[in-house]
Swiss-Prot record:
Belongs to the universal ribosomal protein uL14 family. The keyword tRNA processing does not apply. GO terms for molecular function: large ribosomal subunit rRNA binding; structural constituent of ribosome. HAMAP family: Ribosomal_uL14. This is Large ribosomal subunit protein uL14. GO terms for cellular component: cytosolic large ribosomal subunit. SUPFAM superfamilies: Ribosomal protein L14. It holds the Pfam family Ribosomal_L14. Gene3D superfamilies: Ribosomal protein L14. It comes from Maricaulis maris (strain MCS10).
Length: 122
């Protein structure tokens, strides 16, 4: 579960390395974001000559959470850390590569571009 002030790794090559959630989109009092949800992030750490700079405020899709993800068949999936992919205003990823596995729950949330770029879908 991602909430305000949560630090996340960036799972793409947009130039950001670490981001901090500053807002969970989808309702005035919405507190938590899960896999596939869109959040507003502030870039806390970035590489030189990247597409995004430190201090930029961008939208991002949560692709991995450390909290258990319950599936309909009763199975549970869990990741080692929290990660997000930075997106533009058209909900397309800013980077051209995705690093690490992503869950198939992203497919149900219509983030097909992220699923197709990912090296592994769990």
């Amino acid at each position: 579960m991602i909430q305000m002030q949560t630090n996340l790794d960036v799972a793409d090559n947009s130039g950001a390395r670490r981001v901090q959630c500053i807002k969970v989109l989808g309702g005035a009092k919405r507190r938590y974001a899960h896999v596939g949800d869109i959040i507003v992030v502030s870039v806390k750490e970035a590489i030189p000559r990247g597409r995004v700079k430190k201090g930029d405020v961008r939208k991002a899709v949560v692709v991995r959470v450390a909290k258990d993800i319950q599936r309909k068949d009763g199975s549970v999936i869990r990741f080692d850390g929290n990660a997000a992919v930075i997106i533009n205003n058209n909900n397309e990823p800013l980077g051209t590569r995705i690093f690490g596995p992503v869950p198939r729950e992203l497919r149900a949330k219509n983030h097909m571009k992220i699923v197709s770029l990912a090296p592994e879908v769990l």
